[in-house]
């Protein structure tokens, strides 16, 4: 077709020749993460303390707040479909990936991300970008999972077609390249939001937990493999709520079950360095007295 496919996104399996169809006789394996070709190298951003801040935005008191708070880490939302286009709009940056050109709103990037990241980089703050995909705009429509329920604010990326997979990979490659700049740095990436609550947040329909995790793990691996071409110190984080042994909401998954599947998939398909980004909320979100939580037990 028109796409130049990067085998960094591929996995391989062993098949046995059959009379009518070939038979799968092994787990699929992804590329060895230690052998990913480095297009560039940057220094790690060390954590200086455990103090951090969530949800950075560009505002008039940003530099004052960063200086006064003395944080070492922070997060920033990266809503891909807000600034990515499939056809050129005025002021867009043209970016070619896999033989196809995609378009990114430069002014949005500057005002929403660049200005903030320049300030955090000057202060040695380790920033994690939270990858979010709202099913809006032409890029969001292409990236929308085919079983998205039409209600949740975000969709699981659609990795069921070459066109949509390449679009998602192009967004990841663009962001990884742009923000592996030491003067404008995103050090780590959080993959979507509260995936144990996929029914309400990162949605791909009502799926068995193993099916959901198989898809989510592909998104994590794509990000990890692409980013590590530009920043070998970067980690990808799985985003959880506070429902570890008990689901945090109706129709949600248990975090512990998801972690067990992460380990099983990684063992079978090739391990990589994933990390946890959990929301340490109380059982009742409106009551911060965690010592009163009856369900907060040592049960892991």
List each language-model region with its residue ranges.
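Substrate-binding cleft/loops of secretory-pathway carbohydrate-active enzymes
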Residues: 236-277
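Glycoside hydrolase catalytic-domain groove-lining segments
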Residues: 260-300
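Short, aromatic- and glycine-rich surface loops/edge beta-strands on solvent-exposed regions
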Residues: 6-23
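Aromatic sugar-binding surface patches on proteins
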Residues: 1-4
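Non-catalytic positions within long, well-ordered alpha-helices that form the structural scaffold/packing
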Residues: 66-67, 121, 269
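Short, acidic/polar
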Residues: 55-68, 168-178, 252-265
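Boundary/entry segment of secreted carbohydrate-active catalytic domains
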Residues: 9, 25-81
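Substrate-binding cleft and catalytic face of glycoside hydrolase catalytic domains
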Residues: 72-248, 283
């Amino acid at each position: 077709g028109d796409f130049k496919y990067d085998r960094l996104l591929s996995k391989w399996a062993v098949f046995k020749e059959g009379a009518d169809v070939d038979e799968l006789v092994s787990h699929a394996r992804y590329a060895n993460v230690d052998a990913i070709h480095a297009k560039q190298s940057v220094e790690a951003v060390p954590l200086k303390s455990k103090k951090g801040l969530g949800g950075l935005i560009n505002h008039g008191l940003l530099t004052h707040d960063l200086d006064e708070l003395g944080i070492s880490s922070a997060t920033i939302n990266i809503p891909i479909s807000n600034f990515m286009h499939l056809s050129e709009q005025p002021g867009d940056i043209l970016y070619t990936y896999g033989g196809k050109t995609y378009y990114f709103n430069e002014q949005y990037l500057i005002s929403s991300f660049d200005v903030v990241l320049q300030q955090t980089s000057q202060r040695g703050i380790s920033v994690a970008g939270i990858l979010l995909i709202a099913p809006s705009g032409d890029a969001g429509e292409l990236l929308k999972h085919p079983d998205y329920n039409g209600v949740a604010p975000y969709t699981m990326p659609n990795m069921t077609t070459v066109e949509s997979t390449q679009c998602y990979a192009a967004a990841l490659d663009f962001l990884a390249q742009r923000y592996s700049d030491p003067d404008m740095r995103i050090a780590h990436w959080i993959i979507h939001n509260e995936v144990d609550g996929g029914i309400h947040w990162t949605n791909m329909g009502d799926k068995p937990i193993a099916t959901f995790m198989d898809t989510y793990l592909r998104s994590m691996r794509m990000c990890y493999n692409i980013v590590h071409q530009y920043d070998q110190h970067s980690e990808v984080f799985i985003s959880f709520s506070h429902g570890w042994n008990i689901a945090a909401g109706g129709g949600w998954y248990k975090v512990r079950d998801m972690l067990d599947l992460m380990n099983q998939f990684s063992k079978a398909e090739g391990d990589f360095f994933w990390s946890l980004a959990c929301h340490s909320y109380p059982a009742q979100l409106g009551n911060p007295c965690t010592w009163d939580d009856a369900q907060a037990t040592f049960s892991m």
